[in-house]
């Protein structure tokens, strides 16, 4: 008889699935396709079907590689013809469901009626016609979340973006009320260069107020693994580019719906680039503790603050029941009536569809559905902002209680990131030096390749192999270019005439103190004819201790003929003492340790205080069972320990007086590890070098430091500053932070009179702690989405640094810079000179760049006390927000500031 009266309604086949690929064939014709991201359809049945004709349907589903696939649901929806007032009551069942979900009631005498009878249908229709429309409303606009890479390579992203953008523009022509929002300046830049005609259409739609660029950083970046300098560049590049391309909009948004957590310092960085609003959805993924707010003021350690919005789900359709549930959830948390809805296929692009817009139009006339209106994100935020002083304040990081393995997966990406960032900062500093000396410094460093690779599925290591294979030449090319640019600029700097120096050492960071100890080609080395302390290196060349330096500086080096000599006494030279059979004590007056073939047995500070309660432990565990394999560390990994086999081999490589270097070996299942311990003269930390041939899968390798003195607090650097946490968790949220990302250091802080142990890192790592230990995750072995993610050779460095007092007064953040970036040598001449003055140990340099009036210096006061900086004779300083210069200024605790350094002459 047909599905319904052909003149009163028609039907849609409604499907939802979980599949790598979905294809729907009707009578041999492909009518719909989907995947893991486009997971539902509402296909309209053809006219002949409504007349009773049969359809030959074939549904093709392909399971994902990492999971079982499924056809989740399949049913028919009946709808009135477009423009029809639904005289047959086709929508009554769905309308009644909406009415009840909005706390409505059933018709009077419902219990006495037959639910399937005509009388019941008439009673429902009358009851719903008389009922009030649900309280509340929704602002809606189309959206298409698009990951720059993930389960597809970057080249596919450009194609997906083009399809999405063309589709959105075509829909705008058919649906005059449609507004569409999209993010990512890097995408718009590609479109402008490679699809100029399409970009011109986007610009026209933007000027008409229908295309809304919801940009923020250059890409939707990772926000817990990148340094402060990179995060600053992300926002600065993104905001500047957005203002240039779309001047008709104000650009005050940080649109980051899908990044894996947000560092406590992000408000300071974003606010400094003009951002006022932060928007995300990701905290809805919290596994243990639902995030309590939907709109709030996020306050950093300093005085910075962002208005913050927890977005509705991304990638949704226009189901009126889902929209009602979102509005009710919003109202319950915020007390506000008007909510936001951003429908559109996401992750791999797509955006809104005709089906979606038809569904919105269908329910606009129904009194049981929420009132909706098309608008923009900025209109919604402006409305919210009227009552922002009543919002709750959040004074913490926005920790994602999921994806705790991202800091450890794919360490090669983290290594590339830290190396390229260092080279870019050095190139920028060299440009500032040229500007100070009156040389040409007009060219700027290209940060865009680095910023692109910091996307939240590339840097964390959570993409398919092709993404990383294609990223490798990008990393290498960008590193080579930054290296060449840095050296080219340094070569232009003035140097004394007639200098005999043929090498030079550069320390471009303005640290309080440098004690350079470098390995140079074999020979006898001197500075300005003054011989230097030297030691022949076991692996070739000569260890040379340079004079102490301060600030940004350079040291000319002269290589003479002959062998290295120890005639010059070293500062805090290394002394090795054999304590017994196979046990040695090594020290330099600042730190000492005991070692045997069993490993690091003991560690002491300069006063002889023990730092370890037992030997350093190398631990290996099974890491299996989480759905998001590359993302998530198994919650129960400590319940599944695996073995580590010592080889009883200890081999000395260097034995002082400048460097003591020894090597141990360990067997880790099918993998092997070489652990080097190295202590340098006049250095307050012990360096550990882990060289690992990793062949394990679904395992985690960790270092564990048992502390001799209980910790009460843990400090660690984070994007935009420093965060401190209790050593023992108290609240449920603190218990959920059992593994966290750290960028370059973390430190235990003991009770009064203080002191503790700092672990200095060569790049981001996952770490954990308690009051009696510190732990570092070295390697994992996930197999999805990259089957060989962490396999192969890895070299990772870290250092153990005991300290007295607080980590801030001990200069731990600057020590981490000195460990990670110990300066560099180049076969070119230079002057013996301090180019820029030194910062106090309590201040951490972030970046140095050329400025019209001098040198732009960004820095952080990471500690808990105010710090005064007096650059010294010949220098003045001012804030970028103030035109008056001064000989000194005070930096408040937690402040991230931009200063202009000028020569007083």
Model-derived features: positions:
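Aromatic-lined ligand-binding clefts that engage carbohydrates, nucleic acids, or primary amines
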Residues: 3-28, 57-59, 506-508, 518
